[in-house]
């Protein structure tokens, strides 16, 4: 299984997926082999990751008409064609990559998007208060999904806080997911 955190930490709540992937990587060990990737805004560059995966969990914010901090777990097939992090003609989102795989006759991995409705997508670091308040619940939904698929987790002794991850993102030499 592969977890891919998607988003832009320079655009406040849009960075949620990257922060969530880093948080899971830093704070948990897992019973099965699981790859955690900071996908950032890579789009098309994640195509080879998708081709090598049989099960993908995409962590991202979802621009839906709902209350900020609402959490969704949606099979990628149900939102295929819409593309997450679609930044325009020059950028291809991860779901569009799956569409490309299907058009090329390649096997598309089982995929789910676990997303949260953003409160603020502006050019600044950090997360809005609404998303910070919902973050632990969001992580819990991700962990429940993993457990449901036979991947148990254990919290590590020396944990990294969300604030530490946000501060790490502000440091150009910082590494979000090692």
For the regions a protein language model found, what residue spans apply to each?
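Conserved active-site and cofactor/substrate-binding residues in soluble primary-metabolism enzymes
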Residues: 15, 19, 41, 66, ...
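Residue-level recognition of the N-termini of beta-strands and the immediately preceding loop/turn
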Residues: 1, 34, 109-112
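Generic secondary-structure boundary/loop-capping signal
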Residues: 41, 68-71, 89, 118-120, ...
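Nucleotide and nucleotide-moiety/phosphate-recognizing core
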Residues: 3-4, 9-78
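Predominant activation on well-ordered alpha-helical scaffold segments within soluble catalytic domains
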Residues: 18-22, 47, 95-98, 139, ...
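Phosphate/ribose-phosphate-bearing ligand recognition and processing surfaces
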Residues: 83-87, 94, 101-178
């Amino acid at each position: 299984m592969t977890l891919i955190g998607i988003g832009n930490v320079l655009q406040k709540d849009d960075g949620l997926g990257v922060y969530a992937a880093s948080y899971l990587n830093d704070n948990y060990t897992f019973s099965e082999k699981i790859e955690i990737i900071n996908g950032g805004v890579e789009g098309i560059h994640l195509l080879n990751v998708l081709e090598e995966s049989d099960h993908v969990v995409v962590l991202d914010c979802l621009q839906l008409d709902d209350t900020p901090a609402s959490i969704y777990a949606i099979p990628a097939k149900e939102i295929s064609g819409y593309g997450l992090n679609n930044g325009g003609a020059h950028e291809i989102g991860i779901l569009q990559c799956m569409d490309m795989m299907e058009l090329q006759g390649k096997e598309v991995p089982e995929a789910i998007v676990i997303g949260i409705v953003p409160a603020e997508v502006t050019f600044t670091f950090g997360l809005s208060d609404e998303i910070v308040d919902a973050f632990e619940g969001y992580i819990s939904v991700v962990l429940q999904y993993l457990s449901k698929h036979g991947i148990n987790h254990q919290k590590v002794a020396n944990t990294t806080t969300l604030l530490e991850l946000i501060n790490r993102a502000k440091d150009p030499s910082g590494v979000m997911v090692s």
